[in-house]
Regions:
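Structural alpha-helical scaffold elements that stabilize or flank donor/cofactor-binding regions
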Residues: 20-21
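Structural motif
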Residues: 28-30
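Cysteine-nucleophile active-site neighborhood
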Residues: 33-105
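Pocket-forming structural segment of enzyme catalytic cores
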Residues: 74-149
């Protein structure tokens, strides 16, 4: 992320410091790994609290991969572990009943819908790279801005207010 932002001419700070995040004018929560472990780490450093605070103040917030999953209410990957609950819906495992390989690794076309801000300059059905075993199911279809197909319709991107 840091190199991509630098390439775009944006300054960034990698931190888990509450006050640094609290003062940021934009926040990105990337992530790779386990939903439960990630939530434990957010709570350990009180980052769950500062994430709620910046989102309530309408600071632009981008969750990428696991960072996006954590914004939801929970995940089948870590039953009983609550997510941040900033978006309604859940994270579910891609079913292996279709004979598809799990994890899903590879290029898929992105189907844009509902006029998302993030993909304004991306053509319909552009190919993007996926590496995942779980995907999000947003409770409200109107926040879904991009989907892809991998045995099931996968909500690949959502937007709600500043998130």
């Amino acid at each position: 992320m840091e190199k991509a932002l630098a390439y775009l001419g944006e300054e960034s700070v990698i931190t888990r410091d509450f006050h640094t995040i609290e003062q940021a004018d934009k926040v990105i929560l990337p992530g790779v790994g386990s939903f439960g472990v990630a939530m434990d780490n957010l709570k350990r450093y009180e980052l769950d609290k500062v994430i709620h605070e910046v989102c309530e103040r309408k600071v632009p917030f981008l969750g990428i991969c696991l960072g996006l999953q954590l914004m939801f209410e929970g995940s089948e990957e870590s039953e009983g572990v609550e997510g941040l609950g900033l978006l309604e819906g859940k994270i579910v495992r891609i079913p292996d009943t279709y004979g598809l390989k799990i994890p899903h690794i590879g290029w898929n076309s992105l189907h844009l819908q509902n006029n998302g801000r993030l993909f304004q300059n991306v053509p319909m059905d552009a190919y993007v790279y996926f590496v995942h075993s779980y995907y999000l199911q947003a409770k409200h279809e109107e926040i879904v801005k991009a989907t892809t197909e991998y045995g099931v319709t996968i909500h690949a991107s959502v937007e709600q207010d500043n998130i």
